[in-house]
A protein has these predicted regions:
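Flexible "cap/lid" loop of the alpha/beta hydrolase fold
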Residues: 99-103, 109-142
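Conserved alpha/beta-hydrolase catalytic His-Asp/Glu region
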Residues: 125, 141-193
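Conserved serine/cysteine hydrolase catalytic core
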Residues: 173-234, 242
Length: 266
């Protein structure tokens, strides 16, 4: 099963789990501080920080590397938990995985949270796609992390994003190398861009409520998409859009706003 970490309030025995899904090139730990603060305020919930297939500690998963395969992995993980999964939150790439999980597997699911991700299909573009090209142009071994960050910077990647990406380097006898398989990452991203999940938003599974969180300084969720989400909510009464200040990495830029939303609506 997927590598994961369970987070609960001290001495709490939560009655339900929230699955937390990172973006491409990320790992479950990206969400640890937000979720620790959330469960302190809502000890009835526990959070499961998931490493999606071929990320973090989740290695050796067979192809195809698709959104549906990633969602099926979650279903297998949910079956091992002592309490039911009642909600799933996904950031960026993880947002689409969350929607596919709700559509195809999420028995007993009450809520889906899609954080700065779009349900729309489209041509591959944006920072994650640009990163794929950049890492293929730089060496696959480095003496230091700083050398890797500088190499990415020379390819047009901003220093903060390069520093974050360098957390995917592992140290061995011959220096630092990437622990991600970028061919697998490409397969996952191609499926992400190829998959249209508007039908899930416009006709959510029974009883499921969907919350979208748009980061105001990010272009991932266009105004056109926001209008369509709000229209879906007016029609079905189970979809809601929240706008928060911050860029795409809203869990780092504005964690307080996310925590407030989760405490209020979950």
């Amino acid at each position: 099963t997927l590598a994961h970490e369970r987070i609960t309030a001290t001495d709490a025995a939560p009655s339900r789990w929230l699955l937390v899904l990172h973006g491409i090139y990320g790992a479950g730990r990206n969400w640890a501080s937000v979720m620790r603060r959330f469960v302190r305020q809502r000890p009835d919930w526990g959070a499961v920080l998931v490493d999606l297939r071929e990320h973090g500690g989740s290695r050796g998963f067979p192809p195809p590397h698709t959104l549906r395969a990633a969602a099926a992995d979650l279903d297998a993980l949910a079956a091992t938990l002592d309490e039911p999964v009642r909600a799933v939150l996904g950031h960026s790439f993880g947002g689409k995985v969350a929607l596919v999980y709700a559509r195809d597997f999420g028995r007993g699911l009450d809520q889906v949270w899609v954080v700065d991700s779009t349900p729309a299909a489209g041509t591959p573009r944006g920072s994650a796609w640009e990163m794929l090209a950049a890492v293929r142009r730089v060496p696959d071994r480095f003496e230091t992390r700083a050398e890797a960050v500088a190499a990415l910077e020379a390819e047009g990647i901003s220093r903060p994003v390069g520093q974050w990406m360098s957390t995917n380097l592992i140290h061995g006898p011959d220096g630092y190398r990437w622990r991600l398989d970028f061919d697998v990452m490409e397969s996952m991203l191609l499926d992400f861009f190829d998959t249209d999940l508007w039908p899930v938003v416009e006709a959510p599974p029974a009883r499921v409520r969907i919350h979208f969180v748009k980061a105001e300084e990010s272009a991932v969720l266009t105004e056109e998409a926001c209008a369509r989400i709000e229209e879906a909510g007016r029609r079905n009464g189970r979809v809601r859009l929240h706008r928060v200040a911050g860029g795409h990495w809203v869990n780092a830029d504005n964690p307080q706003a996310l925590e407030q939303l989760l405490v209020e609506y979950l």
